[in-house]
Curated annotation (Swiss-Prot):
This is Phosphoribosyl-ATP pyrophosphatase. Its EC number is 3.6.1.31. It is found in: Cytoplasm. It is an enzyme of class 3 (hydrolase). The gene is hisE.
Length: 105
C-alpha cells in the first residue's frame, strides 16, 4: 500500500494550495461535490473499458479511479487508512454475512 499512501500524501500536500499550480489543487478547490462527480465520471469510464475487455485501457482507467477516489476522500478529510480499517474488519466475512450485519435504514 505504500504507493497509495504516497499518492495520498501528495494529494494532501496540494490541499489549500494555488489551484493554478496543479490539477489536484484545482479539483480540491472546487469542493467535495466536484471531487465526487469526477470520481463518478472516472468510474463510469472504467466500467466502459471493462465491458470492452481492453485490459490496458482498463488498467489506465483503474489508475484514474484510484487517484480520484483518494482526492474525494481528501476532500472530505477521510484517510485512506480509515477505508483500509473497514476492509480489514470485513476480511474473513462472507459478503452476504457482512451485508446482513449492516444497520438498516
Amino acid at each position: 500500500m505504500t504507493l497509495l499512501h504516497d499518492l495520498e500524501q501528495t494529494i494532501l500536500s496540494r490541499k489549500g494550495t494555488d489551484p493554478d499550480t496543479s490539477w489536484t489543487a484545482k479539483l480540491l478547490s472546487k469542493g467535495p461535490e466536484k471531487c465526487a462527480e469526477k470520481f463518478g465520471e472516472e468510474a463510469i469510464e472504467a466500467i466502459i473499458e471493462a465491458v470492452k475487455d481492453d485490459k490496458a485501457k482498463l488498467a489506465s482507467e483503474g489508475a484514474d479511479v484510484l487517484y480520484h477516489f483518494l482526492v474525494m476522500l481528501a476532500a472530505r478529510d477521510v484517510a485512506l487508512d480509515d477505508v483500509l480499517t473497514v476492509l480489514a474488519e470485513r476480511q474473513g466475512l462472507s459478503g452476504l454475512a457482512e451485508k446482513a450485519a449492516r444497520p438498516k435504514g
